[in-house]
């Protein structure tokens, strides 16, 4: 998948792809998009953002995700699940 992240605006989402300057815009809710992408490769980290887990470059102490050229803040509602993913993804 070339999807870096998805951002939502009411009943539309913008899908940002690797190598593309402009996002794809489609008429679908974030909830519906989250269900379509829920393969374990994507995670919602904010009310308005879903990120491709394999495209994350880094995460800082303030739970900001660096993906592509974007910095996305992981909000409190999603922080616990995201931190659990990070722990599980770390090599033992």
Where do the model's predicted regions map?
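Conserved binding/recognition cores within well-folded domains
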Residues: 1-67, 73-74
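Generic C-terminal helix-cap and adjacent flexible tail
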Residues: 87-92
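Hydrophobic side chains in well-ordered alpha-helices
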Residues: 33, 82-85
């Amino acid at each position: 998948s070339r999807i870096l992240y998805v951002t939502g605006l009411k009943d539309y989402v913008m899908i940002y792809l690797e190598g593309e300057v402009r996002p794809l815009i489609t008429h679908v809710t974030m909830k519906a998009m989250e269900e379509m992408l829920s393969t374990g490769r994507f995670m919602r980290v904010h009310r308005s953002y879903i990120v491709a887990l394999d495209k994350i470059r880094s995460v800082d102490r303030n739970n900001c995700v660096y993906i592509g050229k974007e910095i996305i803040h992981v909000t409190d509602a999603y922080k616990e699940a995201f931190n659990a993913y990070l722990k599980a993804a770390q090599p033992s």
